[in-house]
Amino acid sequence: VTDEAVGAHSDAAVHGSATTGLRVSGPDEAFLLAEEKLGFRTPIQFCWVLDDDPGLEAIERYAESLSTGLLHRAISRRRFPAARRRWVSSRVQPRIIVGARIDDAEIGAWADNLLRSADLRPAQGLGWRVHTTTTTRGRRVVVLLLSHLIADGEAIMRALVAAADGETTALADPDTARGARALAEDARDSARQIRSAARSVRAVARDARQRRRERREGTAPVVPNRPPSPPPTYDPYRATLAIVDVDRDLWHAQARQYGGTGNTLFTALVCGLVRRSGYPVGDQMRVSVAVSKRGGPEDLRANASGGIWLRVGEPQESPADLDYLRGLSRQAFAEYAKTGTD
């Protein structure tokens, strides 16, 4: 966990009380800049198909409970140059959209369309939304759409459990981001960010000098020339979405049969799909695996994840036995534990 990340949540209070001083930092800033500067949004979708319909009122109560937790957040405007923006409680009312009844065979297409047309504005406080409908067989379908900007996987699961248990954790009221005290806090944070940026510039300059020195002395690593990748045979701007139902017990049994875990089997499946798609990956496929950096209940950051990179060789180097991937993972996790570098 970086110093900035620690500072982002060290002032956070425990469950049941408002929090102040929670800054938009680390991965949050990356998602925010991607939305603001590139128009690149990162919606996440959860879909539940309930054989026994609990009724619309039950869905409304659960959405109301979600609105008292950490998913219901917004970003206050920057009031001092270079200061990080603040997370505050959203004043937007929770949104539940009830759709017309659909055929059971259309559940996948319905969920697919919701994800593709998601219009979330997390910085303004509309970071999540609930859609629900019923099917011709009387089942209830519930979709939760939310922006990755407001939560990572573990934060989402914590929020879902807290809502089910009736727990509340309110972020600071938007008014707390105003006034003389808030301005002074922003000034101090601005100074810290400027000092941090200066250190980064010095580090980059040192690295550049080192590379120039290696080139002069002939000790720089030689990068082999690679042939250009063939043009893609697919539309790179349209993601392919699919819903696959897998028996949980069967999944874990298959993983054990091949000497792996549920996670390594999933990694192997993804690698196989990428290779069969024809996507150009070179000699080694780089696979990112998320790693949680989240602390206890007092850690109220939206995103607190890092990651490791696996470099998976050609299929003949990675047989069906999952020990190969487990070995790569163990090595990467051990290195990550020592360096903490994503």
What are these regions (language model features)?
Residues 41-46:
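Generic N-terminal amphipathic, Lys/Arg-enriched alpha-helix
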Residues 30-31:
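Nucleic acid-processing catalytic cores of prokaryotic defense/repair systems
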Residues 4-22, 48-56, 61-68, 75-342:
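Soluble acyl-CoA-dependent acyltransferase catalytic core bearing the H(X)4D motif
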